[in-house]
Curated annotation (Swiss-Prot):
<keyword id="KW-0408">Iron</keyword>
<keyword id="KW-0004">4Fe-4S</keyword>
<feature type="binding site">
    <location>
        <position position="20"/>
    </location>
    <ligand>
        <name>[4Fe-4S] cluster 1</name>
    </ligand>
</feature>
<dbReference type="GO" id="GO:0051539">
    <property type="term" value="F:4 iron, 4 sulfur cluster binding"/>
</dbReference>
<feature type="binding site">
    <location>
        <position position="232"/>
    </location>
    <ligand>
        <name>[4Fe-4S] cluster 2</name>
    </ligand>
</feature>
<feature type="binding site">
    <location>
        <position position="68"/>
    </location>
    <ligand>
        <name>[4Fe-4S] cluster 1</name>
    </ligand>
</feature>
<feature type="binding site">
    <location>
        <position position="414"/>
    </location>
    <ligand>
        <name>[4Fe-4S] cluster 2</name>
    </ligand>
</feature>
<dbReference type="GO" id="GO:0051536">
    <property type="term" value="F:iron-sulfur cluster binding"/>
</dbReference>
<dbReference type="InterPro" id="IPR009016">
    <property type="entry name" value="Fe_hydrogenase"/>
</dbReference>
<dbReference type="Pfam" id="PF02906">
    <property type="entry name" value="Fe_hyd_lg_C"/>
</dbReference>
<dbReference type="InterPro" id="IPR050340">
    <property type="entry name" value="Cytosolic_Fe-S_CAF"/>
</dbReference>
<dbReference type="GO" id="GO:0046872">
    <property type="term" value="F:metal ion binding"/>
</dbReference>
<comment type="similarity">
    <text>Belongs to the NARF family.</text>
</comment>
<comment type="function">
    <text>Component of the cytosolic Fe/S protein assembly machinery. Required for maturation of extramitochondrial Fe/S proteins. May play a role in the transfer of pre-assembled Fe/S clusters to target apoproteins.</text>
</comment>
<protein>
    <recommendedName>
        <fullName>Cytosolic Fe-S cluster assembly factor NAR1</fullName>
    </recommendedName>
</protein>
<dbReference type="InterPro" id="IPR004108">
    <property type="entry name" value="Fe_hydrogenase_lsu_C"/>
</dbReference>
<dbReference type="GO" id="GO:0016226">
    <property type="term" value="P:iron-sulfur cluster assembly"/>
</dbReference>
Length: 491
């Protein structure tokens, strides 16, 4: 387990179960035998005739976790270290030993939140942090390409707004947070129909990067190794979902769209293990900054920010689309905002100033404590297909929150949203968590913003093919069947 991953790093931590209940296949011997521990610490099966057989350790992958209902969200963080910076270093070490004709192409995508965290942690601008990160990835580690997450995010935002506009069921709930998605699939399957079917920027980026590189470099998906730098450990679980991978002839296992996810703080630990520091990294030449991207990749759109929350701006973009549909010139509507019992519950309403009518409304719900309140109000009432009505209250939004009235809800598992993810660089000693979150968010908001453009979607459609666009942008969710612990093997 990674030394930087602990319960202290997890927001709204949910304690893991005492044992993992994932059944493990055991090959039992037909003869009498005993288990002994060898001199080197290995487990040995010793037969009555004195013969010894070394036993293989039980192994558990992230994919196993996603298919098991034994634990949820935070508990799985005990296992996400299996996909970590050490895995990346191992892959780079293996690559260095290969002949030039057999080397893979390494590409890294970097989230906006991670860039802001680096800048806040080391007291530099986001542009300087980007220049140092480019230097680390391209010159020190030997990556071929470095891209931002802007292209994937623009596509995700546009399709999210289109989905809400077409939906006949309220609410549509953001599904870009894998911690939230796992929680729903394993404990509240009645919420699955409300989840947005649009992939996250990480996965859209992963699909497009492998497609573009394979087409322009004439290689197979297995010859491209894609790393994402993200603010959240649960993003490792998302990358491990079976649907986000492709089959390739000659390969025993499917090839993932995102091969490895490392968090912001894991990048810092990687540097420490290499006797380096982020502050000591040189800044890459400006001619290579933001331009070391695959051929045909729209670099000019890739590093820009978007208006809205530091969790990706989903609510802002969706609500703006709904407002423009009613009021194209934005001259006879206003947006009202109301805070709930805490800063992580917000309600936004588009009001027609001429009639006083509420044209559209949306909510922002962050943190598991608030999510649990939300989920309870989505439970079907007995004998009816409608959600449970919220209790009347004039005190706070959260007390009166009625999910069925919202067109869209931006849901994130971490209090404060993605900018405050468990994988971000932590607050310095003496700095309060809320103050540090605000400082990181200030860095995030300093990234220049651009309006979301359909041009990126048009480009992606040409690259991907118009008939297969569904595979590029659509995700699927399903209930994870509960395992009977009484029948499962424990170890």
């Amino acid at each position: 387990m990674s030394s930087i991953l602990s319960a202290d790093d997890l927001n709204d931590f949910i304690s893991p179960g005492a044992v993992c209940i994932k059944p493990i296949k055991v090959d039992k011997t037909t003869e009498n035998a005993e288990i002994e521990i060898g001199a080197q610490g290995q487990a040995l099966e010793v037969g009555i005739d004195g013969t010894q057989k070394e036993l293989e350790p039980a192994q558990l992958s992230l994919s196993d976790c996603l298919a098991c209902s034994g634990c949820i969200t935070s508990a799985e963080s005990v296992l996400v270290a299996l996909q970590s910076h050490t895995q990346l270093l191992d892959e780079l070490k293996k690559e260095a030993e290969l002949p030039s004709g057999e080397k893979r192409i390494f590409v890294c995508s970097v989230s906006h939140q991670a860039r802001a965290s680096f800048a806040a942690a080391f007291g530099v601008s986001v542009e300087v942090a980007d220049a140092k990160l480019h230097s680390l990835l391209l010159d020190t580690l030997g990556f071929d390409y470095v891209v931002g997450m802007g292209v994937g995010r623009e596509i995700s935002l546009i399709h999210s707004a289109q989905e809400v506009e077409k939906s006949t069921q309220k609410p549509v709930m953001a599904a870009s947070c894998p911690g939230w998605v796992c929680y729903v699939e394993k404990t509240h399957p009645h919420v699955i129909p409300y989840l947005s079917s649009v992939k996250s920027p990480q996965q859209i980026c992963g699909s497009l990067l492998k497609k573009v590189i394979c087409d322009t470099r004439r290689v197979k998906p297995s010859q491209v190794y894609h790393v994402s730098v993200m603010p959240c450990f649960d993003k490792k679980l998302e990358a491990s979902r079976d649907e986000f991978s492709v089959e390739e002839a000659g390969q025993e296992e499917k090839i993932r769209d995102v091969d490895c996810v490392i968090t912001t703080k894991e990048v810092v630990q990687l540097l420490t293990e290499k006797d380096m520091s982020f502050g000591g990294l040189p800044e890459i030449d400006k001619s290579r900054l933001y331009t070391s991207v695959p051929e045909t990749w729209p670099a000019e759109r890739d590093w820009a920010n978007h208006v809205g929350s530091s969790s990706g701006g989903y609510l802002h973009h969706v609500l703006t689309a709904l407002r423009l549909r009613h009021d194209p010139l934005e001259t006879r509507t206003r947006v009202d905002a109301s805070m709930g019992k805490n800063q992580d519950v917000m309600e936004y309403s588009v009001i027609d100033t001429e009639t006083g009518e509420t044209v559209a409304s949306a909510a922002q719900v962050y943190g598991f404590r608030n999510i649990q309140n939300l989920v309870r109000k989505l439970k079907p009432s007995r004998g009816k297909g409608k959600v449970v009505s919220a209790r009347k209250s004039t005190k706070t939004v959260s007390a009166a929150l009625n999910p069925s009235t919202y067109s869209y809800i931006e849901v994130m598992a971490c209090p404060g949203g993605c900018i405050n993810g468990g994988g971000q660089v932590g607050a310095p000693e003496g700095v309060a968590a809320r103050e540090w979150k605000d400082e990181t968010e200030k860095m995030y908001n300093s990234i220049p913003s651009e309006a979301v453009s359909e041009e990126v979607v048009d480009w992606a459609t040409k690259v991907w093919g118009p008939h297969d666009e569904d595979k590029l942008v659509t995700a699927h969710y399903q209930e994870v069947e509960k395992v009977d612990q009484g029948l499962a093997s424990t170890w």
